[in-house]
């Protein structure tokens, strides 16, 4: 019977150690930066296409980019943020716009 209790104690200690070692992933803000050349309609398109915002929210964020110089499009894990930044920047270049999407640690 002592062996069963030892096993249960070991499992509890192992579970506690794993919980201590688990950390939430680092999060990153994906940011759209203003420029003087990208049309507002294109920025709205980007916000809808890559961040799934409805037209009203996309318009609000586009105006934030326009008037404040930048806007946070969302906060994501590193891999998701990097992918979104790469896709947005490629889409902008493919459409011959200088729109710049960046990320920074949240």
Curated annotation (Swiss-Prot):
Give one Pfam hit by family name: ClpS
- Report the SUPFAM superfamilies cross-referenced here: ClpS-like
Q: List, in alphabetical order, the GO biological process terms annotated in this UniProt record.
A: protein catabolic process; proteolysis
Disulfide bond entries: none
Q: Per its UniProt record, what InterPro entries does this chain match?
A: ClpS (IPR022935), ClpS_core (IPR003769), Ribosomal_bL12_C/ClpS-like (IPR014719)
Q: Please, which domain of life does this record's source organism belong to?
A: Bacteria
In terms of PANTHER family, this protein maps to:
ATP-DEPENDENT CLP PROTEASE ADAPTER PROTEIN CLPS, ATP-DEPENDENT CLP PROTEASE ADAPTER PROTEIN CLPS1, CHLOROPLASTIC
Family of this protein: Belongs to the ClpS family.
User: How is the quaternary structure described?
Assistant: Binds to the N-terminal domain of the chaperone ClpA.
Q: What does this protein do?
A: Involved in the modulation of the specificity of the ClpAP-mediated ATP-dependent protein degradation.
- Its protein name is ATP-dependent Clp protease adapter protein ClpS
* Species name: Erwinia tasmaniensis (strain DSM 17950 / CFBP 7177 / CIP 109463 / NCPPB 4357 / Et1/99)
**Where is the organism placed in the taxonomic lineage, from the top?**
Bacteria, Pseudomonadati, Pseudomonadota, Gammaproteobacteria, Enterobacterales
Q: Which gene encodes it?
A: clpS
């Amino acid at each position: 019977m002592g062996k069963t209790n030892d096993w249960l104690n070991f499992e509890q200690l192992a579970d506690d150690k794993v919980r201590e070692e688990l950390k939430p992933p680092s999060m990153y803000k994906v940011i759209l930066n203003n420029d003087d050349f990208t049309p507002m309609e294109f920025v709205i398109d980007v916000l809808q296409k890559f961040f799934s915002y409805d037209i009203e929210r996309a318009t609000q964020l586009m105006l934030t980019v326009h008037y404040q110089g930048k806007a946070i499009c969302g906060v994501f894990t590193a891999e998701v943020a990097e992918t979104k930044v790469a896709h947005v920047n490629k889409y902008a270049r493919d459409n011959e716009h200088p729109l710049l999407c960046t990320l920074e640690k949240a």
